[in-house]
Amino acid sequence: MNIERLKMSLGEAVFTQRSMRKLKPDAIPDEDIRLLLEAAVKAPNGGNHQLGRFLVVTDRKKITEFGALYREAWWAKRKDDHGWSGPQDIPKGETNYNAAMGLADAMKDVPCVVFALTVPPGGANSI
């Protein structure tokens, strides 16, 4: 692992982080993805269980298909919970829903999707 590429201190990373809802569509180098996944598996977790796996998708066609399914599922959940069928139904001032809707709309354009797959302790491996 090439940790020299991580130029930011831990404190700076923790205290300056922010949510990113607008992402560049640029491809992410495999080396960067590997570095992030290596950091993820080194992070503390409950009971020190390292039972997870990662599924990394960088194929544009698959991401576009996933993005469409994600958006469809997002709106289905809003319809079930609130009766909303589109942006016009979101009450004014519901900024969290507007931001989440933006992510649902943009999911098709992200450069990479990482699925974290877990297995409960004593459970069978499955997706």
Show the residue positions of the predicted features.
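Specificity-determining recognition surfaces
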Residues: 1-38, 50
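Residues within well-ordered alpha-helical secondary structure of globular protein domains
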Residues: 16, 39-42, 69-72
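Glycine-rich phosphate/pyrophosphate-binding beta-alpha loops
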Residues: 43-49
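Short, low-complexity, polar/charged sequence segments that are solvent-exposed and flexible
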Residues: 33, 42, 73-77
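Glycine/small-residue-rich phosphate/adenosyl-binding loop
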Residues: 50, 56-127
